[in-house]
């Protein structure tokens, strides 16, 4: 995969070259370039912004630097690419979007700054994404989050490809609880089922606890997926168990 980032602050992306993404670059699974589009400015002061027509607060990014930076990307890497604009008005980024984008050969991230963009810049863009209903100083942090989420899904990037397939949200559910040694610590024990070596029971426990965690923490996710009969049965068990716990807690508080 080729990833290009257009940013006024290229040094912000250096930490991405560490750890997992750094290994992806070393293994030649990823080419990662950051372009400072200030270098495409047309005036001696290297301005890339200007006041908006019609008045208003703040400054807008001018079209020329970003259009010409994209020209440079297209010259170096001809061919189709997804061009992503980080914008609060974009669609919400999620795991499904990360999975889809990880299938692409070339991604370009445009990171804005200041009050906003000249509207003509949007003609360069294939996708607009937001991390949530809040505004950040620039597009760099959202781009880094997206890049990390996407690159870890590339085959061969994680030490164990199964890790990506058991992540939270991969099957629409939150991930089940996990434990390592020691089997008991400060009175907290690892569930016996995880220690008995029965893989069928372990798989059932994990599915049930994944459903439980989703039901308790993100019940909205259960409305967006279709559960098979086994999962539906496990979810009914979870709801019964949690209702019993809640009733017992109420009685305890009343006594």
Curated annotation (Swiss-Prot):
Compartment list: Cytoplasm
Q: Name one GO cellular component term.
A: cytosol
Specify where it is mainly localized: cytoplasm
Is the keyword Methyltransferase assigned to this protein?
Answer: yes
Recite the UniProt keywords alphabetically: Cytoplasm, Methyltransferase, S-adenosyl-L-methionine, Transferase, tRNA processing
Q: Which domain of life is it from?
A: Bacteria
One GO biological process this protein is involved in is:
tRNA N1-guanine methylation
Quote the catalytic activity from the record: guanosine(37) in tRNA + S-adenosyl-L-methionine = N(1)-methylguanosine(37) in tRNA + S-adenosyl-L-homocysteine + H(+)
Q: Which InterPro entries match?
A: Alpha/beta_knot_MTases (IPR029028), tRNA_m1G_MeTrfase_C_sf (IPR023148), tRNA_m1G_MeTrfase_TrmD (IPR002649), tRNA_m1G_MTases_N (IPR029026), tRNA_MeTrfase_TRMD/TRM10 (IPR016009)
Q: Which GO terms describe its molecular function?
A: tRNA (guanine(37)-N1)-methyltransferase activity
Tell me its EC number(s), please: 2.1.1.228
Cross-referenced CDD domains, in alphabetical order? TrmD-like
Annotated residues that bind S-adenosyl-L-methionine are located at: 112, 131-136
List the SUPFAM superfamilies hit by this protein, alphabetically: alpha/beta knot (SSF75217)
What does the UniProt function comment say about this protein? Specifically methylates guanosine-37 in various tRNAs.
Protein name, per record: tRNA (guanine-N(1)-)-methyltransferase
Q: Say which species the protein is native to.
A: Lacticaseibacillus paracasei (strain ATCC 334 / BCRC 17002 / CCUG 31169 / CIP 107868 / KCTC 3260 / NRRL B-441) (Lactobacillus paracasei)
What gene name is given for the protein in this entry? trmD
């Amino acid at each position: 995969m080729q990833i290009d980032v257009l940013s006024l602050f290229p040094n912000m992306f250096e930490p991405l070259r560490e750890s997992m993404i750094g290994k992806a670059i070393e293994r030649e699974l990823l080419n990662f370039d950051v372009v400072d589009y200030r270098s495409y400015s047309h005036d001696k002061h290297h301005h890339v912004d200007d006041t908006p027509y019609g008045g208003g607060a703040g400054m807008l990014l001018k079209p020329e630097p970003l259009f010409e930076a994209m020209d440079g990307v297209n010259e170096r890497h001809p061919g189709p690419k997804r061009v992503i604009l980080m914008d609060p008005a974009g669609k919400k980024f999620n795991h499904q979007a990360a999975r889809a984008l990880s299938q692409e050969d070339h991604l370009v991230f445009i990171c804005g700054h200041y009050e906003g963009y000249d509207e003509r810049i949007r003609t360069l863009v294939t996708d607009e994404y937001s991390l949530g209903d809040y505004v950040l100083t620039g597009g760099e942090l959202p781009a880094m989050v997206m890049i990390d989420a996407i690159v870890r899904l590339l085959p061969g990037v994680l030490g164990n490809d199964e890790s990506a397939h058991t992540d939270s949200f991969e099957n629409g559910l939150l991930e089940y609880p996990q434990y390592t040694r020691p089997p008991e610590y400060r009175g907290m024990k690892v569930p016996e089922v995880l220690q008995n070596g029965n893989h069928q029971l372990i798989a059932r426990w994990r599915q049930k606890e994944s459903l439980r965690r989703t039901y308790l923490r993100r019940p909205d996710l259960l409305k967006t997926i279709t559960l098979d009969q086994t999962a539906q049965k496990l979810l009914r068990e979870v709801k019964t168990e949690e209702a019993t716990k809640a009733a017992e807690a109420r009685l305890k508080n009343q006594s």
